[in-house]
């Protein structure tokens, strides 16, 4: 019979027999089993099975059997197996029986839609009755829904596991890239990165275990889908480890990545007339060498001079508004930053040790030649070689007071002095006058009480001609070594027992031997005096030190000086000609005789010289009189290679009587 939309109680109800009930139950069980199998097969096949049935339906449009199967598979594939949909179907089953019955009946139900909702459906009255059909159909729908939900949960679990494996592989690749990027970082940073890397791996493993545990239950399919979406998008790299302020202070300004750049001190000008004036650092090449290593300047209680020295020159239009206008060149040293430093010997670099100490009152050092005229300022090189650095805050001699282990920047000020103005002595007075400030970044230095960097010490010894105290002698901490060395040298030269060539002989040899070779040889002999001043050598050894004999003399009856074998000394020292010392001795004897007779000696000797006034040596060559020691008292001054010969006074009467 046909089942229409009319009420079912319009026809008389028939009581089913027991045999019909048993047949209906067996058929219902078969339908449930077949429905579950069909639902599982549809879910496994997916879209391929759907496309296959679409093509099959296109080739057989008039076949009702294929059309019926196609509608049935479409219903199964389009079914939503989410939790919300299953609960909605379960809640609406008692109120609206037709959608659930018609959508899940495997044998005799067509596809239900809004357009054919009023169509009649053929129902076998013999197999079922109105009283048993609703409950049996609901049970079949519940069983099919449960089977489909189980199959969907199994598939979602597999997809979630695959997504987790992909996410773990991506995380491992990102970790390898981060390790390669930070391979050249410092040891401290590598340790912190290793710690963060280990903690991130622990969190990832715990999250992976939780995700696997949650994906096993069918009630967490929504979280699994979210994990799949998160795996498709690569996670951003973790932020770099944050550094504490204490760690930043331990790093040097050049090595701290998060630290702000060192503030740079720039020049200034408050006068338009001084704007085109330029200042040039004369010793820029030497300053650049020290700046690459980190310049250090010694400060002491008594004050120490700067090396390299600040030497500048000026160029440009130095205008003179009034005839009385003059210029002054000033120097001051200002702190570069507000930090105190320490030197790390194991790293050979300067590190920040903390905040700076309170700065002493700023002082301005004026050049001693100031004030200068514009013409003199253009031609003159202004050298601040006399400025001294000290750490004595009670100093009253005008020295620049600095703090040890702090960085400083020297500045040059060009001040125009009008009529009635004096040289400023403080920064406050400088601001009230027309001036221009020049800054050279290569002159930055660190004030120290002892050199920290060994390369700086070596460079200063090699570059500073007054650094002999570092090579030789004692450790003088509170005294300036340059004046001490000058004092020792002066005392040594005053008491030197040996002079190669006396000054009367030099005055006689200089006009005759005016060629460059002879003068250079004499200067070399004078320089050797510094080496042999404290040695017991006398003038008798001069022939053996400076002369190589051409032929050995005949054997004398007694031992003589020619028997000495000086070896390498004879080959290293500059050699003189064979007759140079003999003629020098003759000229010395003539000079002494002329001084005794108060007359000028002849310029040259054409005849054989007279017998020497002094005893001759065993080798036959005349030697200077070793007993004439009082003659040396007339020349106690220190030797200079550019000494001008002075007029010799006549010797005393005692010397006249002794001379022949």
UniProtKB/Swiss-Prot annotation:
Pfam families assigned to the protein according to its UniProt record, in alphabetical order: T-box
Here the segments flagged for biased composition (Polar residues) are 1-11, 23-33, 643-660
Location of the region described as Disordered in the Swiss-Prot/TrEMBL record? 1-72, 90-122, 169-266, 598-660
Q: Which GO terms describe its biological process?
A: cardioblast cell fate commitment; cell fate specification; chorion-containing eggshell pattern formation; embryonic heart tube development; heart development; heart process; leg disc pattern formation; positive regulation of transcription by RNA polymerase II
> Where does the UniProt annotation locate this protein?
Nucleus
Q: Does the keyword NADP apply?
A: no
Q: Which SUPFAM superfamilies match?
A: p53-like transcription factors
Q: Where is the composition biased (Low complexity)?
A: 12-22, 35-47, 93-108, 169-179, 199-233, 614-624
Q: Which UniProt keywords apply?
A: DNA-binding, Nucleus, Transcription, Transcription regulation
Biased composition, class Pro residues, residue ranges: 234-243, 600-613
Q: Which residues bind DNA?
A: 286-472
Q: Name one GO molecular function term.
A: DNA-binding transcription factor activity, RNA polymerase II-specific
Concerning PANTHER family, the annotation shows: T-BOX PROTEIN-RELATED, T-BOX TRANSCRIPTION FACTOR TBX20
Q: What is this protein called?
A: T-box protein H15
Which organism's genome codes for this protein? Drosophila melanogaster
């Amino acid at each position: 019979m046909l089942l229409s939309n009319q009420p079912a109680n319009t026809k008389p109800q028939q009581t089913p027999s027991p045999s019909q009930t048993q047949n209906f139950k067996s058929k219902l069980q078969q339908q449930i089993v077949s429905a579950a199998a069909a639902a599982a097969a549809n879910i496994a096949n997916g879209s391929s099975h759907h496309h296959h049935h679409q093509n099959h339906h296109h080739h057989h449009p008039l076949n009702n059997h294929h059309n019926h199967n196609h509608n049935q598979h479409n219903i199964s594939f389009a079914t939503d197996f989410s939790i919300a949909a299953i609960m909605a179907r379960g809640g609406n089953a008692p109120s609206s029986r037709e959608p659930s019955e018609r959508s899940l009946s495997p044998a005799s139900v067509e596809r239900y839609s809004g357009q054919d909702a009023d169509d009649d459906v053929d129902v076998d009255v013999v197999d079922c009755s109105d009283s048993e059909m609703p409950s049996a159909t609901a049970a079949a729908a519940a069983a099919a829904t449960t089977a489909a939900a189980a199959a969907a949960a199994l598939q979602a679990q597999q997809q979630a596991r695959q997504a987790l494996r992909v996410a773990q592989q991506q995380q491992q690749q990102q970790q390898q890239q981060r390790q390669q990027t930070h391979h050249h970082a410092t040891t401290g940073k590598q340790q912190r990165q290793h710690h963060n890397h280990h903690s991130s791996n622990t969190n990832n493993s715990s999250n992976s275990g939780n995700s696997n545990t949650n994906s096993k239950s069918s009630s967490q399919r929504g979280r699994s889908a979210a994990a799949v979406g998160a795996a498709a998008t690569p996670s951003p790299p973790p932020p770099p480890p944050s550094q504490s302020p204490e760690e930043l202070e331990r790093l040097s300004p050049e090595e701290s990545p998060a630290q702000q750049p060192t503030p740079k001190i720039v020049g200034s000008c408050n006068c338009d007339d001084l704007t085109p004036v330029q200042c040039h650092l004369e010793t820029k090449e030497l300053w650049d060498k020290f700046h690459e290593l980190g310049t250090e300047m010694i400060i002491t209680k008594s004050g120490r001079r700067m090396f390299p020295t600040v030497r500048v020159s000026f160029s440009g239009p130095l205008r003179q508004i009034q005839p009385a206008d003059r210029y002054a060149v000033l120097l001051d040293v200002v702190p570069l930053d507000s930090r105190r430093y320490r030197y790390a010997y194991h790293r050979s670099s300067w590190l920040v040790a903390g905040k700076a100490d309170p700065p002493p009152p700023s002082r301005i050092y004026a050049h001693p030649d100031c004030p200068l005229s514009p013409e003199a300022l253009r031609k003159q090189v202004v050298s601040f070689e006399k400025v001294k650095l000290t750490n004595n805050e009670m100093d009253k001699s005008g020295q620049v007071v600095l703090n040890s282990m702090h960085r400083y920047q020297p500045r040059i000020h060009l001040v125009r002095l009008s009529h009635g103005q004096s040289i400023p002595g403080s920064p406050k007075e400088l601001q009230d006058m027309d001036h221009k400030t020049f800054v050279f970044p290569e002159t930055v230095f660190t004030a120290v009480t002892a050199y920290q960097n060994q390369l700086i010490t070596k460079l200063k010894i090699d570059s500073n001609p007054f650094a002999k105290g570092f090579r030789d002698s004692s450790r003088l901490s509170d005294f300036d070594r340059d004046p001490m060395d000058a004092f020792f040298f002066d005392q040594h030269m005053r008491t030197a027992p040996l002079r190669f060539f006396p000054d009367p002989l030099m005055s006689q040899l200089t006009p005759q031997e005016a060629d460059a070779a002879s003068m250079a040889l004499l200067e070399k002999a004078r320089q050797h005096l510094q080496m042999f001043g404290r040695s017991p050598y006398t003038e008798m050894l001069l022939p053996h030190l400076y002369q190589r004999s051409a032929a050995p003399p005949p054997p004398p009856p007694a031992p003589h000086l020619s028997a000495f074998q000086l070896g390498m000394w004879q080959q290293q020292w500059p050699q003189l000609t064979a007759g140079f010392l003999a003629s020098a001795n003759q000229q010395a004897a003539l000079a002494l005789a002329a001084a005794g007779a108060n007359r000028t000696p002849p310029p040259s000797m054409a005849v054989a010289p007279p017998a020497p006034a002094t005893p001759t040596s065993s080798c036959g060559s005349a030697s200077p009189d070793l007993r004439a020691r009082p003659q040396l008292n007339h020349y106690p001054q220190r030797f200079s290679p550019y000494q001008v010969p002075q007029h010799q006074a006549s010797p005393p009467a005692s010397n006249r009587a002794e001379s022949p």
